[in-house]
């Protein structure tokens, strides 16, 4: 993950 791991997780769950 990058620095914004939270953002990456949200993108993964986004359709």
Curated annotation (Swiss-Prot):
GO CC annotation: mitochondrion; ribonucleoprotein complex; ribosome
Q: What is its main location?
A: mitochondrion
Question: So which domain of life are we looking at?
Answer: Eukaryota
Q: Where in the cell is it found?
A: Mitochondrion
Give the UniProt keywords, A-Z.
Answer: Mitochondrion, Ribonucleoprotein, Ribosomal protein
Q: What does this protein do?
A: Putative component of the large subunit of mitochondrial ribosome.
Q: What is this protein called?
A: Putative large ribosomal subunit protein YmL12
Which classification does the entry list for the species?
A: Eukaryota, Fungi, Dikarya, Ascomycota, Saccharomycotina
